[in-house]
Amino acid sequence: MQQAADDAEAMLEAAKFACRVRRRLGLSQAEFAQRIGVSVETIRNWEQGKRCPTGAAKALLKVLDKAPEAALAALTLTLAIAR
């Protein structure tokens, strides 16, 4: 029972964190999704607590929180090269 409560709390915290990072950057969900290379549905799922960012996505959100300009510049370059 406690594990389920802890999991729900972790999902809520992840949702708040993802939303806070995006809003601090001043981006809509669509703009944020495009900038970080994921679907709008992924962003919505994170922010609604339906899914929790893991792995590289979780690390990226942490970097965007601490050094947004550098992270966005690197992402812009990476996405441009990929195209």
How does the language model describe each region?
Residues V38-P53:
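Recognition helix of helix-turn-helix/homeodomain-like DNA-binding domains
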Residues M1-E13, E69-R83:
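N-terminal flexible/basic segments that precede or flank functional cores
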Residues G55-A73:
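DNA major-groove recognition helix of helix-turn-helix/homeodomain DNA-binding modules
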